[in-house]
Each structure stands twice: as C-alpha cells, then as structure tokens.
C-alpha cells in the first residue's frame, strides 16, 4: 500500500535530459510492473515537453514486454509535432535497453465547440454501497489464504465501490458488464495534468477482469495469466480524482485468448469525463 503523496512522487518521474526521463516502480504483489503506472508516467514525461496551454485529450499505448519492478524505467520522448492547436508526442519506455511500452499522446488548446454525451447509467450512489474490501471480508474466515492474497494485490490508495459484487469475488458466470465507483482516498491539490496521470493509473483496474465475467465458473479455480496488451484513454472534460467517479465497463468480445473491454467514466453529476478501451491477454497456464 502506498500513500497519495507516494503515488504523486511515483508519477512525477525524474528528468535526466530534455527528452529523457527515469521512473521508479510501484512494487506489485506479482512482481511485474503495473500497466497503469507506465501509462501515468509516460503521460507525465510527454507533458514535460508540451506547451503549458495544451491539455492531453487522448493517449494510445501498447505494452510490448512485461516490466520488472526491480529495474527503473527509462522514458524517451519524441516531439512529433507542435501545431497551432494540437501537439503530438511519442513516448517509448525501456528497461535495460529493451522497449517495454510505447505510446502516442495528443494535446489540444482549450476551444469552444458543440457539446453532447451519453447518459450516465442509472445505478446506486456510492453512499449506499460497500467497498470491495468490505465485500471481501467474508472471505477472512472462509478462505483466509485467498483473502490475504487479494489484499496484498489490492491498490488501497483507491477506494472501489462495485455496484454489484466485486469481479474478483464472483464465482458464477454473468454478463460482461461492471459498474464501479472509485476515487483516490486522500484529498489532493493537483492541476489537470496530474489528475489525468492519476486517472490513467486507475483506469487499468477492472477492465480486463470484466472480460472474464461470462467465464468465471470455468476459470475461477484455474491458473490464469493476465496481461494488458494495449490501452487507449480519451479525456473529455475536467474532473477531480478525489471525488467519486463511476467506471461503466463492458466487454463486447473475448476470443483467441484475448479479451476486449471498453469503459466510460462519469462524475457524480453525470458528466462524462473519459473513455477507455483495452485488449488484454487471458491465457490459461498449461
């Protein structure tokens, strides 16, 4: 478990040269670098090379190799283009000289324009729901080893309140849909760039697991290997990461050991603040 300040420090990577940055790693329970960390750090690196009047509106990344949590990550930024309204950057992340991730990000000046959005799903509000940890407490007596394993892997810097049972607790097949309220636990003061970096970190949770929902009975007791393959994030409107946000996720398809999921993120007033897509590997150990 890390604190909010430690997360901010993790995402605020060190600048070594104009287009070269080095980041440390969030120590995951499974020993591999968490994809959300690389998303947030790469966005931070790109932001450091962009004019201050431009805000990220989209980022598209590919996870090439699994990262080692014990090795710092080098981020190299290419300044692809600075236009009158848009700026484009490419970021490649390396460990020991090998590329583990690459991303393209686009930044845009503030402009007036037309406005519409889809409606937020009609679900219970967070004040009426338990956190996923509260849901999991029933496991303590029933299966203490599994409970400890789940808690060790849990990013307790964030609060998650699933509208239904937390995905990792489900043992029956269901539709590939999930609605999860989330926020960072501590109140923070941060500009929109840092808010976006923290959202990028958090957006990697629950997406791939949603693709497992129609298959829980088959895989819940199986040894599975999960890994994000790519991740795209669009920022539509400003938001506060320490206020409750609703992550509405669906998985339209799973095939060939890959699951595809997409999510829409709303604030409590129903404002759509971001969209996310991801494809991930869902492979059984043989």
Pin down the residues of each PLM region.
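Terminal targeting signals and extreme-terminal segments of soluble enzymes
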Residues: 1-286
């Amino acid at each position: 478990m890390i604190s909010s300040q430690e997360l901010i420090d993790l995402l605020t990577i060190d600048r070594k040269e104009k287009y070269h940055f080095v980041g440390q790693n969030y120590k995951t329970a499974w020993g591999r670098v968490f994809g959300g960390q690389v998303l947030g750090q790469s966005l931070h690196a790109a932001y450091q090379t962009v004019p201050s009047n431009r805000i990220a509106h989209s980022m598209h990344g590919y996870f090439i190799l699994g990262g080692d949590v014990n090795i710092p990550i080098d981020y190299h930024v290419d300044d692809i283009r600075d236009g009158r309204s848009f700026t484009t950057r490419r970021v490649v992340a390396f460990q020991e000289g090998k590329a583990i991730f690459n991303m393209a990000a686009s930044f845009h000046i503030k402009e007036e324009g037309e406005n519409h959005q889809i409606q937020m799903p009609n679900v219970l509000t967070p004040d009426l729901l338990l956190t996923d940890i509260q849901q999991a407490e029933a496991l303590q007596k029933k299966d203490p080893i599994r409970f400890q394993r789940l808690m060790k892997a849990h990013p307790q810097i964030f609060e998650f309140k699933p509208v239904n049972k937390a995905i990792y607790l489900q043992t029956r097949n269901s539709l590939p849909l999930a609605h999860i309220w989330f926020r960072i636990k501590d109140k923070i003061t941060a500009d929109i760039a840092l808010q976006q970096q923290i959202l990028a970190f958090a957006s990697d949770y629950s997406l791939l697991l949603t693709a497992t929902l129609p298959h829980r009975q088959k895989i819940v007791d199986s040894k599975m290997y999960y890994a994000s393959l790519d991740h795209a994030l669009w920022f539509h409107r400003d938001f506060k990461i320490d206020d409750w946000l609703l992550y509405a996720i669906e998985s339209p398809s799973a095939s060939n050991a890959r699951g595809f999921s997409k999510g829409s993120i709303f604030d409590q007033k129903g404002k759509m603040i971001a969209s996310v897509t991801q494809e991930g590997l869902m492979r059984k150990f043989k």
